Amino acid sequence: MTADTGDTWHPGELTVQARTGVTEKMAGLGPRLIRDSMPDPHRDFFTRLPMIIVGGEDGAGYLWAAPLFGEPGFIRAPSSYLLTITLTAPCPHPLFSQLRVNSRVGLLGIEFESRRRNRVNGYIVQRTRDQIDIAVQQSFGNCTRYIQRRQRRHNPQHENVSTEIFTNWNRSLRNVITNADTCFIASACPGEHSENNRGVDVSHRGGDPGFIRFDKQQRLLIPDYAGNNFFNTIGNLVVDSRVGLLFLGFTEGHIISLTATAEVLWKIDEPVLCGEHDRVIRLTLEAGHIIRNALPCLWQSMHDAP
């Protein structure tokens, strides 16, 4: 980011930071922690990954979070301001056929073995059948908290990919989601390309199985744990209710990707629903995809995340 603290946070993030009493603190930290270019350790980090999570908007204006896969090296950072993804493997999620030059995207690199994660937000400057080039507008890291350590292995069923669309929850889907310990959420703050603090973001959410639950109206409830006080996701939801949610079936190779509308519930207003948490995100399903055998690799849990 630029050195101007006014350019670091958008109005939604500033609203949430004010409500939680961290405005002054984050005004000083923001320009130091959120950069407009990738430091060399982040550039090296992305080149080691076999997967990256992408948040983006489809042609109808819905947000999605979806994974891209390849052998380590399929992601490169030719400079501090450019991230290049070579599409060496099929991209079964429909989002990727709809991303174009100037599409805003959020990227999350996560290394389950080390529990490291780094993020890049920006926009596509070149798109071919085999490659996506992204101009970096925001680059920052996150702590390892709530990331489950996992070890990668080959998925022998990966060739048998099939897709099913759903618009309602069934028992099987509810069971998968309520037993998940990890999900990824895409959110957005609309704006022009010149505004570095606007665009799409994708973040990791983790917890013990059962940390995501359903209410009586079959809406998803995701707690917002105390963190770095950036409030990227919560701040986005203050100004734009669209979200994309992704669940990876680490042991069987399937993915569940859905688009939804969301609202932020605050404990002071909804003490029963929020329980011990200061905030909860409540999501109403629009539509989703089950993509079976989409993961070319499986991940075996190594131990519980702190």
Language model regions located:
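Binding-site signature for planar aromatic cofactors or substrates
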Residues: 1-306
